[in-house]
């Protein structure tokens, strides 16, 4: 019977982050109120994020890349390299989440529930990526 590898949970965390990008990450009540999601969609009167490719779009691209790397690690396709890449990408996503907060959250802009969902997903992705990396490297050591 096959066992469930930790890398599949990294895939789940990346999917949660990907979906959370469309949830409200920023909210405001100033000027009539408004919300913005991580990918730049705005509703109401909110000035941030500015138009163009930004941190939120980069997070979506990297979370898609994390899905691929973690799935490769879970399936055993270059598991050591893929699990190391998954850890690197998940740490980078955590840094980008912090950077998003530093760039856009200041009074009267507050974080929305999507930011919390995405932040928790990235934190879990880092922890689970470490477990996936340990599992991949220890499994490769047993085969030799």
Which residues does each PLM region occupy?
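Compact integral membrane and secretory-pathway proteins
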Residues: 1-144
């Amino acid at each position: 019977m096959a066992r469930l590898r930790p890398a599949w949970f990294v895939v789940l965390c990346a999917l949660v982050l990907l979906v959370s990008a469309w949830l409200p990450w920023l909210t405001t009540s100033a000027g009539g109120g408004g919300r913005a999601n991580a990918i730049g969609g705005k509703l109401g009167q909110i000035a941030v994020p500015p138009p163009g490719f930004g941190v939120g779009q980069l997070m979506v691209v990297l979370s898609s890349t994390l899905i691929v790397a973690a799935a490769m690690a879970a399936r055993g396709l270059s598991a050591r390299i893929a699990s190391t890449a998954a850890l690197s990408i998940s740490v980078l996503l955590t840094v980008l989440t912090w950077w998003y907060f530093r760039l856009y959250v200041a009074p009267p802009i507050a974080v929305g529930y999507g930011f919390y969902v995405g932040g928790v997903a990235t934190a879990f992705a880092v922890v689970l990526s470490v477990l996936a990396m340990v599992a991949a490297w220890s499994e490769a050591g047993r085969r030799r």
